[in-house]
């Protein structure tokens, strides 16, 4: 058993409101420059829908991910080394700009420089950000079908619907939808790393983050076609591949990713998981695609097991990382409550961004029919009869196996009904918890984690090299930085709110007050927000 650590994320889809704040802040932080106009490390898709790029789940077309060989091994779906060498100068499975969209801007100078009093109203025509030519008609964008806006034209092209042989009503009153935020999966068995001829893609051993070495990248773009989630992009200006970095500079100082920090719905959870690296090939090569979900769960190790802790120490994993893994919300959502599921495990990459499936399509349908959307008996009956949402979610998260999805949704439904009784002042009904194999205390703990968890409960992130202070040499490019002061370090690097209020904060001294409003919870008085009248 070789224990390794992985920074993982879970997103609770019921809490996503589709505001795209995560996409905007991620783009401003990482891809707000020439050559990256079409690149979105984080994007939010409306489901059912074709996604971004269009039809990225159609692996018959793109040939991303792995396939199992007749001998029980794995090979990239797009082919091995010989095929890569034969097509290295022309990759036939590469998405074109039309599969994404041609980024554009407008001729704002024409508006600003238009002479006063001219007979016609000046207009700002769209122009391409790739070659500067005028665009006659804008036909697609990164979020064209948001909120089922393109349902009549694009809904039938959803690869999951086609794969599951499902037909969804296009009338808005009969349709169902939910939002799916996507980032790089930082897989345990990434195809992009194996597809790169230059060896520029690599997975960090200390935290499992998959990155691109910009110095070694030669722009072959095999990683783009190899990634089944299409989360590796090509910068047409630099000629290099780029991808989501999981905001590793922030994680190294104990701060969450930008998308997590700015998420309005507070739907993201970050934490450490341990896994057995020796069993990754075995799990990824599981014969039945519907068994891949359980196979991946089987290689994730219990951080409370003394044998796992002993093996982690032997591998040099710091004690602070072991403590973080034991407090990880990711472990609770995947194992303790059996809620979180991986995205398309059939790609055999063992993704490490998991999702709590949404109950909202079922609740909305039940409520629209005039029934009680909070009654667990009604919801559990609806889950058994409304097969389209259930089978669609199974096509996304469990390779078509509806049992894990139904189990997760049943527990979410039980939580709604159980907590309603408590909030209304009624006696808790233990039968509701027992109907889904849980106790009332477990339901309440699950509710606290999903609904009202505080900042430090959602993000349990150990710092890099926690047992020793950071070397000052590595921080020289940032100027005068004190590596022993984490509050000042974050402030100097511009990497988010400080962890705590500094001494004298809000007491009326000459120094500016610094308050972390991100970690403030309703009902509490943030220290330093208001001056102490008694001290004046």
Q: Could you describe each region identified by the protein language model?
A:
Residues 1-536:
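Non-ligating segments of multi-cofactor redox enzymes
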């Amino acid at each position: 058993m070789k224990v390794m650590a992985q920074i993982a994320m879970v997103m609770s889809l019921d809490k996503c409101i589709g505001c795209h704040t995560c996409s905007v802040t991620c783009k401003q932080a990482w891809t707000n420059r020439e050559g990256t106009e079409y690149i979105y490390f984080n994007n939010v898709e409306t489901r059912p829908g074709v996604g971004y790029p269009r039809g990225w789940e159609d692996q018959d077309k793109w040939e991303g991910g792995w396939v199992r060989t007749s001998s029980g091994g794995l090979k990239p779906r797009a082919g091995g080394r010989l095929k890569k060498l034969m097509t290295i100068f022309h990759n036939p499975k590469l998405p074109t700009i039309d599969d994404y969209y041609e980024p554009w801007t407008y001729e704002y100078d024409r508006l600003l420089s238009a002479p006063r009093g001219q007979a016609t109203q000046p207009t700002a025509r769209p122009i391409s950000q790739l070659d500067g030519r005028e665009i006659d008609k804008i036909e697609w964008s990164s979020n064209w079908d948001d909120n089922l806006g393109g349902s009549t034209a694009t809904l039938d092209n959803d690869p999951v619907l086609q794969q599951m042989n499902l037909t969804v009503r296009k009338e808005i009153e009969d349709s169902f939808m939910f939002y799916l935020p996507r980032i790089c999966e930082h897989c345990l068995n990434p195809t992009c790393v194996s597809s790169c001829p230059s060896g520029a893609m690599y997975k960090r051993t200390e935290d499992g983050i998959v990155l691109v070495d910009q110095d070694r990248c030669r722009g072959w773009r095999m990683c783009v076609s190899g990634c089944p989630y299409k989360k590796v992009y090509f910068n047409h200006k630099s000629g290099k591949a780029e991808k989501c970095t999981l905001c590793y500079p922030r994680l190294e100082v104990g701060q969450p990713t930008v998308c997590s920090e700015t998420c309005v719905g507070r739907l993201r959870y970050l934490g450490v998981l341990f896994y057995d690296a020796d069993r990754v090939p075995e799990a990824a090569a599981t014969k039945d695609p519907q068994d891949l979900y359980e196979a991946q769960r089987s290689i994730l190790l219990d951080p409370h097991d003394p044998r796992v802790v002993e093996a982690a120490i032997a591998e040099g994993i710091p004690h602070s990382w072991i403590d973080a893994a034991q407090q990880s919300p990711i472990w609770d959502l995947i194992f303790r409550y059996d809620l979180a599921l991986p995205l398309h495990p059939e790609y055999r990459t063992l993704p490490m961004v998991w999702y709590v499936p949404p109950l909202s399509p079922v609740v909305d349908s039940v409520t629209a029919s005039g029934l009680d959307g909070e009654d667990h008996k009604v919801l559990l009956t609806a889950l058994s009869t409304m097969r389209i949402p259930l089978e669609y979610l199974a096509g996304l998260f469990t390779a078509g196996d509806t049992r894990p999805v139904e189990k997760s949704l049943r527990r979410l439904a039980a939580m709604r009904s159980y907590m309603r009784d408590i909030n209304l002042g009624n006696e808790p009904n233990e039968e509701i918890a027992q109907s889904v194999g849980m106790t009332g205390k477990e339901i309440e703990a699950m509710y606290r984690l999903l609904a009202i968890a505080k900042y430090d409960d959602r993000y349990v992130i150990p710092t890099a090299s926690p047992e020793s202070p950071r070397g000052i040499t590595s921080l020289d490019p940032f100027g005068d930085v004190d590596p022993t002061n984490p509050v000042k370090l974050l402030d100097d690097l511009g990497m988010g709110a400080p962890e705590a209020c500094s001494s004298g904060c809000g007491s009326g001294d000459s120094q500016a007050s610094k308050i972390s409003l991100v970690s403030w919870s309703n009902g509490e008085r943030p220290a330093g927000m208001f001056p102490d009248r008694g001290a004046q």
